[in-house]
Every structure is written in C-alpha cells, then in structure tokens.
C-alpha cells in the first residue's frame, strides 16, 4: 500500500499496458427506498449542473431523445426524455428531490414498479435496435457544465437528418447514432467539431481503439497525452506485445 498506486494508470489504457487477472469488489447494502422517474421536456436547460451533481441519491440519469422513444414505440411529444433512478435510506430525501423537480418546466412521471422495470429494459434495447440498422455510432463526452449547450447546438445539426441520441446525462457521455446516411462523413466531422468546441472527447466509455486514432489527433492536448502514453508504453511493454494497434501509429 506504500507503493505508487498504479490502478489509475491502467484505467483507459485499453489493454495496451497490462491486463487484469483478478478483481476484488466492494459491495454495499441495498438502499431502503428506490424510485424511477421519467422527466420529459423540450428544454434541457432545466437540468443544469447543480441539479445533476448536487444529489447523491441519483443512481442513474439516462437521456433519450424523442427519436429513441419513438423507436421504442413510446409516443413522445418532447425533444428530450430523462430517466432517473433515485435511491435513499430516507424516503424524505427522495421526496425532497421530487419537490425540487416539480418546480422545473418538465413533465414528471413517477413510475410504478412494473413501469420502471419496463422502461429500464427498454433503455437497454435502444442500442440493440439501432444496431439492426445501417448505423454509425459516435461515443462522445463533454463536460457536464457544457452538456446542455452542446445538446442544444447538436439539435441544429440533427435537423432533417436521421440521428438518434441517448446516453448518460450525469457524466456527459452521449451516444450519437447516424442511421442510413449515405453521406455521413460531413455530418460526423461537424459533430466532432462541435465536441471540440465544448472541450469534449471523441471517446467516452468505449475507448479510442483503432478506428478513432485519427480523430483523436485533432483534439485538445493530444500531443502531450500521446507523448506521455508512448513513454509509458515503451517502459511497460517495450516489445509492443499488448494491443499493438491501439492508440499508437
């Protein structure tokens, strides 16, 4: 325990600097109370950083645009739908957050147990249903403080284009899916330019890998990050055995 903590070094290295042979998990008692809530709105501004980050009882915060809802055969009259899971040991904590939400300009739908199970199951179906189409998937991330502005400008790009958006609102991770687009590269480039504008990343949870190496080159801080990674790679895997085509040219 007195040695340097190398755990962070391996996070996000995508198998280029080592591999995991054993995992030890800490578990926590289940919370006494759990509620799922669906918020629907045309204006994401109501979900500012304060609301997203200042509540420890939000265990999941998922965004589905109206196209994703329609894909699930759920009628949506709003541009954005936000599915929350709230957990607490004190029921009053959940009631307090819901009271705060009631003051926002959103439709609030408290889901019963059956409805909650159905909605969370459907949320997991979205990427599966989209994978059945001719889809190009972008896995981007922007700072939570910039997420609302980013999504507002992304809507302008979406106009008259078959683009689906869903993702993890709490950490700024948005999956942007282009469907049946014969001329998709200009749209992809436009989305990446927008991501750079808000100091975002071309990779959130699915890594840079091989396909996005050329995209990563154009993002802020790339040269310094690449130089550091290259140095670490050389010291830990000088023969380039692990993930030889990931990250590096």
Regions found by a protein language model. Give the residues of each.
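Activity-critical C-terminal alpha-helical subdomain
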Residues: 212-249
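Short secondary-structure capping/turn micro-motifs that flank functional sites
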Residues: 67, 117, 211-212, 249
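Short acidic/histidine-rich active-site segments
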Residues: 201-208, 243-245
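Hydrophobic alpha-helix feature that most strongly marks membrane-spanning transmembrane helices
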Residues: 159, 196, 200-203, 234-237
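Conserved mixed alpha/beta core segments that line enzyme active sites in large multi-domain catalysts
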Residues: 1-14
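Shared catalytic-loop signature of beta/alpha-barrel
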Residues: 182-189, 194, 207-215, 219, ...
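Short conserved micro-motifs on helix faces and helix-strand junctions that flank
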Residues: 9-12, 140, 167, 203-204, ...
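C-terminal substrate-recognition/cap domain of FAD-linked oxidoreductases
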Residues: 11-13, 19-190, 194-198
């Amino acid at each position: 325990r007195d040695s340097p903590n190398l755990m962070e070094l391996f996070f996000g290295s995508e198998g280029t600097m080592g591999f995991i042979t054993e995992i030890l998990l800490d578990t926590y008692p289940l919370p006494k109370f759990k509620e799922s809530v669906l918020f629907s709105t045309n204006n994401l501004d109501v979900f500012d950083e304060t609301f997203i980050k200042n509540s420890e009882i939000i265990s999941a915060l998922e965004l589905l645009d109206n196209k994703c809802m329609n894909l699930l055969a759920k009628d949506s009259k709003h541009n954005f739908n936000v599915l929350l899971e709230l957990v607490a040991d004190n029921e009053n904590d959940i009631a307090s957050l819901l009271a705060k939400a009631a003051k926002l300009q959103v439709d609030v739908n408290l889901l019963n147990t059956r409805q909650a199970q159905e909605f969370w199951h459907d949320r997991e179906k979205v990427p599966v249903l989209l994978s059945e189409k001719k889809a190009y998937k972008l896995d981007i991330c922007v700072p939570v403080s910039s997420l609302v502005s980013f999504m507002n400008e992304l809507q302008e790009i979406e106009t008259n284009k078959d683009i689906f958006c869903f993702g993890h609102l709490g950490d700024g991770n948005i999956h942007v899916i282009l469907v049946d687009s014969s001329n998709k590269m200009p749209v992809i480039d436009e989305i990446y330019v927008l991501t750079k504008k808000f100091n975002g990343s071309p990779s959130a949870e699915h890594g840079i890998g091989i396909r996005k190496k050329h995209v990563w080159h154009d993002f802020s801080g790339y040269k310094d990050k690449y130089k550091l990674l290259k140095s670490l790679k050389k010291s830990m895997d000088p023969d380039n055995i692990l993930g030889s085509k990931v990250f590096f040219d």
